[in-house]
């Protein structure tokens, strides 16, 4: 999607990234989801009441959705925990179900849509400022936005 915007094939693109920074592109943040741990209630880490330190995941198989794999490998790798990723799933629900079935932990970008899939689980924040993913609209800096493009971004509230 980024090459399409850079090459003027598309005017606006929506991407999900932890820290989107593109030199030739202007970014307009749209949504931000915190990345959290989803833990079965019987798991030892479910009893914690404070954010979980990344080191506490050491030795625990983790399930993560693909869209946060780069973020997890980067942040967890600094703490030698990245190799604990046991499965990369296509969607949050699959990671949650995997954690539920195998009594382990899913690391997911949590949104309101995930609430119904986690009623029997414990949601815990992760103690690291880089544990989030954003949806951002990308626009080429050198390109003037069309009337329709401006209207769209204004309508959804990312352009004032």
Regions found by a protein language model. Give the residues of each.
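Flexible hinge/capping segments at coil-to-helix
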Residues: 24-35, 39-62
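Short helix-loop capping/hinge motifs at secondary-structure junctions, enriched
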Residues: 42-52, 70, 128-131, 142-148
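Hydrophobic hinge/microswitch elements
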Residues: 1-9, 16, 68-124
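Ligand-binding clamshell of periplasmic/extracellular solute-binding protein-like
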Residues: 2-3, 17-26, 45
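A late-sequence structural motif
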Residues: 123-160
């Amino acid at each position: 999607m980024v090459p399409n915007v850079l090459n003027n094939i598309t005017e606006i693109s929506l991407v999900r990234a932890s820290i989107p920074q593109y030199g030739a592109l202007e970014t307009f943040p749209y949504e931000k989801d915190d990345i959290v741990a989803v833990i079965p209630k019987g798991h030892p880490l479910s009893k914690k009441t404070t954010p979980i330190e990344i080191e506490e995941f050491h030795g625990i198989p983790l399930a993560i959705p693909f869209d946060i794999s780069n973020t997890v490998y980067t942040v967890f790798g600094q703490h030698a925990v990245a190799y604990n990723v046991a499965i990369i799933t296509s969607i949050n629900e699959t990671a949650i179900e995997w954690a539920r079935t195998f009594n382990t932990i899913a690391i997911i970008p949590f949104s309101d849509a995930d609430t119904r899939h986690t009623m029997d689980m414990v949601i815990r924040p992760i103690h690291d400022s880089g544990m989030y993913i954003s949806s951002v609209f990308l626009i080429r800096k050198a390109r003037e936005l069309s009337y329709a493009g401006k209207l769209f971004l204004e309508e959804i509230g990312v352009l004032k």
